[in-house]
Regions:
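Feature marking well-ordered beta-strand scaffolds used for ligand recognition
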Residues: 1-318
């Protein structure tokens, strides 16, 4: 079992007292690895510290022929102080060592997970011609009446489709299709932008890996973004077909029921429902509830079900 840890208060010893100092040898931000052979007594058997913590991670391959699991780590937190982790470099202009604009490739030896380590931190957003690490969206709006989109310096979520050797990355300011034939060296196949997306949050393949749904977490998951006057292509899903290793936009989808100004609502996590010969997606919308849509026809997604609760009575959300 692999667990992502990003919070600054997290401790190496899992203690409850937190960590208060700016730089501390007691802090843990990265991935924890557990042996869960005995489900009633999970045991931590490995841990890997990273410069930006671990917001999400993706198991890309393994066990390999040499008994290793390969994981992509996506950290979205601030870069650690170099007094805490010497190799961590923040946003220093012109410094190619920066921990920004990268993902981490982590190797976990099954025979001894305590030896797990970062083997590389590829600059997956770099401009292939200039070498600039900030090679994709630089942040800001796209013109009049468009969304203000975050700079692409991190991936929030990378989803893999192992049999096709591809991955889809929701990477703050862009959606990316990766070639992972060599899992140690992911390569960009295509990059897309959306003038209505604020923050590319998650990516989900359909059953056969021919489509990708990207979600936009406009407002950071803490604001009302499903009001009657909010654009239907802001804080929504974007559906793409994969054609010749390129992402071709087909449509947007957003839950159809307007929510109140007090209801925290925006596209959040979702999952494919494995129905043969159909593409069906269940989507969470925080206090907006959940929706199920059929996107078998990528250009015309159909509402199948909507569950929404009264935020005044139920503040749990989905």
């Amino acid at each position: 079992l692999i667990m992502s840890v990003e919070e600054n208060r997290s401790r190496i010893d899992c203690g409850l007292e937190g960590v208060s100092r700016d730089a501390s040898p007691e802090r843990f931000r990265g991935i924890r690895i557990f042996d869960i052979s005995d489900l009633e007594r999970p045991k931590q058997v490995g841990a890997v510290q990273t410069c930006r913590g671990s917001h999400t991670h993706s198991v890309v391959d393994g066990p390999t022929a040499d008994g290793k699991i390969i994981v992509y780590n996506s950290g979205t937190g601030g870069v650690r102080d170099d007094e805490e982790m010497e190799e961590c470099v923040g946003n220093i202009a012109g410094d190619q060592r920066t921990a920004l604009f990268r993902i981490d490739v982590i190797e976990i030896p099954i025979s001894d997970p305590s030896k797990s380590r970062i083997v590389s931190s590829p600059a997956v957003f770099a401009d292939p011609e200039t070498g600039s690490l900030a090679g994709l969206w630089r942040g800001g709006d796209h013109g009049d009446e468009t969304q203000d989109t975050r700079r692409t310096d991190q991936c929030h979520d990378i989803t893999v489709f192992p049999s096709a050797k591809i991955a889809a990355g929701a990477c703050s300011g862009n959606g990316i299709l990766f070639d992972i034939a060599d899992p140690y060296n992911p390569k960009r196949l295509d990059v897309v932008t959306d003038i209505g997306f604020a923050y590319w949050h998650s990516a989900t393949f359909n059953n056969d890996g021919t489509k990708v749904i990207f979600t936009d977490e406009w407002g950071g998951g803490g604001r009302a973004r499903c009001r009657a006057w909010d654009p239907l292509d802001w804080g929504a899903d974007a559906i793409y077909d994969i054609v010749d290793n390129k992402l071709e936009f087909r449509s947007h989808y957003k839950m159809p029921a307007p929510q109140m100004e007090t209801e925290n609502c925006v596209a959040h996590n979702g999952s494919i429902i494995p129905v043969p010969n159909r593409d069906i997606f269940v989507q969470a919308w925080y206090q907006g509830g959940l929706s199920i849509m059929d996107f078998t026809d990528s250009s015309n997604p159909i509402d199948c079900l909507l569950y929404t609760s009264d935020a005044a009575d139920d503040v749990r959300g989905v």
